[in-house]
Amino acid sequence: IITAVSNNRRKMKYLPPRISIEGHGIKRGLTAVEAAILMEQPLDKVMTMILFGVIKKNAAEVITRDPLELQVTSPLPEGLHEYELNFLKAFKEDDAKARRNLLQEMTVKLIRSVSEKMKGFSRRETLAYYQSIMEKAWQQVEAADTPEVKSQKFDEALEWTMLDKDYDDRTRRVFQ
């Protein structure tokens, strides 16, 4: 049992181990999706965050939920991140196997990109920084007076609140 648990933990690590001197300082400017990769959130949550991001930016709309089918808008809006463009490219693909391969490729590129951006910065300090952004996002939602304002704040801070490991339960508590 102990071996199975330790093997599972090892599989959860996205960022490759590196032997180097830890940098110092906070890496600012990461997106919520990149912060999720840094926090080693489950990949299904990261994919959901990317999906919500492209929908919010009007780059795609959901046609069917199960299996997930997207209608990618044309022309694409400006300001999409590389991982969002790769995500949309994958969903333009009709063949399920090719789509899965493109999504896997997108994920690997995203992880490498985050790893590259973190060079020279303190992982520990950066994690604490993005944890505090997530907490501030929740505080804004919780501080809202009316359900309408609460929903609006939640929509605005969705990507950051999703970083919470307790996202589902906390969302239920906030909107009770």
Name each region found by the language model:
Residues 1-176:
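Acidic, Ser/Thr/Pro-rich intrinsically disordered cytosolic tails and loops
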